[in-house]
Amino acid sequence: MFEPNMLLAAMNNADSNNHNYNHEDNNNEGFLRDDEFDSPNTKSGSENQEGGSGNDQDPLHPNKKKRYHRHTQLQIQEMEAFFKECPHPDDKQRKQLSRELNLEPLQVKFWFQNKRTQMKNHHERHENSHLRAENEKLRNDNLRYREALANASCPNCGGPTAIGEMSFDEHQLRLENARLREEIDRISAIAAKYVGKPVSNYPLMSPPPLPPRPLELAMGNIGGEAYGNNPNDLLKSITAPTESDKPVIIDLSVAAMEELMRMVQVDEPLWKSLVLDEEEYARTFPRGIGPRPAGYRSEASRESAVVIMNHVNIVEILMDVNQWSTIFAGMVSRAMTLAVLSTGVAGNYNGALQVMSAEFQVPSPLVPTRETYFARYCKQQGDGSWAVVDISLDSLQPNPPARCRRRASGCLIQELPNGYSKVTWVEHVEVDDRGVHNLYKHMVSTGHAFGAKRWVAILDRQCERLASVMATNISSGEVGVITNQEGRRSMLKLAERMVISFCAGVSASTAHTWTTLSGTGAEDVRVMTRKSVDDPGRPPGIVLSAATSFWIPVPPKRVFDFLRDENSRNEWDILSNGGVVQEMAHIANGRDTGNCVSLLRVNSANSSQSNMLILQESCTDPTASFVIYAPVDIVAMNIVLNGGDPDYVALLPSGFAILPDGNANSGAPGGDGGSLLTVAFQILVDSVPTAKLSLGSVATVNNLIACTVERIKASMSCETA
């Protein structure tokens, strides 16, 4: 839709419509010039020229004197009355009037045309007069306000003020500086409570020479860092594009679509064994977003898969920012549509163009997120397939500089029989990843963290999950299977919210206002706190979260099976208190038996302790696995299982993210490499949001996560022995 010739055609079409719209008015002006007897200066149309309009004048006798007929008063009154009822009489009505008034049909036709022109001119003169008066009033008001600003005085000192000379940008900067001063005072007060030392002793509280990397900070070295108030946050500094930016965005998007199609369809010499040849790429695509910045590393990957979803639904997911960020919650920590330049044509997304911002994540606090500002363009190809492409727009928003640039990245979606689709995905980015922890450097550098294979694997698994939500042919023969359709949907929706909350809290995203606390001991454990108020999906009070990542020489599949199995839960779950864990109900949501949502009951060994329910979702694909769980109220779960609204069930999810380390030869003999395991807990330490957090609570949570890690390592080492 945004090819130049198509835009030009649209403009020509608009000009053509304007020409047709003014055609009758141009004709009327011609009648008015030639038939001036119908003007107000000639008794309001009381005369008419014999033979009709002046346009019918014989060209051979141009100087022949015109002959006029004056309409009678009765004729004028009758036509005036008819005009009030119907200003545009049809041919039949004109003939009837001509018979009644003893006039020619053409005389009646020309009288009505001239009358309409006369009324139009009258209305235009009246409107112009009104606009001139309004303009004059606004001009006087503007002058009065300018004089008031020029003569303004300070109420404190009586001297002149600088308001009249202050620019809008300067005024906004003053407001922002005041807000930042208040924020610094607030953070300083929090830091003083927990470290007992002046904040000035901590250099990270003052502006550093380089942008700080929160993920490399030792827990004992900083008094407080508020996530979500980072002045270097790219996404918060981005604004919607201006009108002058839009042609640039259109050109970039059209070129990116052409580049994506070639990246998808061409193999040699552009791709060699799934690796992009950078020199061949530069020769093939000399245009684009410019050369790679110094210090940035290029990542390029391509992957294909057949998924169980209609191609139209996949396009809708990609073009709806809410659906996109929900489906890819493990990759997208936050996303926003800043502007919609086109919604598409013919009732679909063909030609749709959006300007977006997004933050991409790895489920670990040791990997910085990747913020990017880009355009997303959707186009239907000639063979009926669909393509969706992203292209960075960081040249339009140079400050602060983006640490990640998306070259033409996206996917080609081809329709297959029986509701299936073939998706071919290309990821091509340039990134400054010097802040990645050494534990994850190999995984990130090989493309396993953010590459095309990760995106396709998530899409494939989520398509299976959505298919299970819509399934109606559910077998009731297996014990514990939930067959109630409404209950299944409510429980899956609750589990989806639990997974999104877990992924959002465990990564290094700056979107969430968490505060890092000092004095927790181990440097590899990240402890954060926040207050939960008026959130029906969370219990009210002070929520404490702890997360850590570590390597274990066990293949991801074995780690996943161990953690999701209720029979081995008491080997690592301290909160189960040695009780027996039993699966009460489950919903399978994929081909892999590990992809399911379960409702677990912990029968405590202590008879005085009431039984506890745990909602758990386990999901796995070749690139990542998750085991996420949360204690739930029995009464609330009964409502959910009967199809009730799950949004009001309070959840504090905890769990595990399991990623392959990317080394196929490491780990146990005969295995598939080691695992990068992230453990995260969220615990309500006080039900009063205004209560003060005790250091004892921080130490307790820190000990809990450390003990859990040791138990997992011990159990895994026993299995590998």
Curated annotation (Swiss-Prot):
Coiled-coil stretches noted in the UniProt entry, renumbered to this chain: 120-194
Listed Pfam families: Homeodomain (PF00046), START (PF01852)
Protein name: Homeobox-leucine zipper protein HDG2
Sequence similarity: Belongs to the HD-ZIP homeobox family. Class IV subfamily.
GO annotation (BP), single: maintenance of floral organ identity
Oligomer and partners: Interacts with AIL7/PLT7, ANT, BBM and AIL1.
Compartment list: Nucleus
Domain START span(s) in chain numbering: 242-468
Main location: nucleus
Binding region for DNA: 64-123
Originating species: Arabidopsis thaliana
Region Disordered, annotated ranges: 17-70
Reported function: Probable transcription factor. Involved, together with PDF2, in the regulation of flower organs development by promoting the expression of APETALA 3 (AP3) in the epidermis and internal cell layers of developing flowers.
UniProt entry tagged with the keyword S-adenosyl-L-methionine: no
The UniProt record lists the keyword Acetylation: no
GO molecular function: DNA binding; DNA-binding transcription factor activity; DNA-binding transcription factor activity, RNA polymerase II-specific; lipid binding
Keywords, sorted A to Z: Coiled coil, DNA-binding, Homeobox, Nucleus, Transcription, Transcription regulation
Annotated tissue distribution: Expressed in hairless cell files of the hypocotyl epidermis. Expressed in shoot apical meristem (SAM) with higher levels in L1 cells and the epidermal layer of young leaves. Expressed in primary root tips, in the L1 of apical inflorescence meristems, early flower primordia, carpel epidermis, ovule primordia, nucellus, chalaze and seed coat.
Entry GO CC: nucleus
PANTHER family in the record: HOMEOBOX-LEUCINE ZIPPER PROTEIN HDG2-RELATED, HOMEOBOX-LEUCINE ZIPPER PROTEIN MERISTEM L1
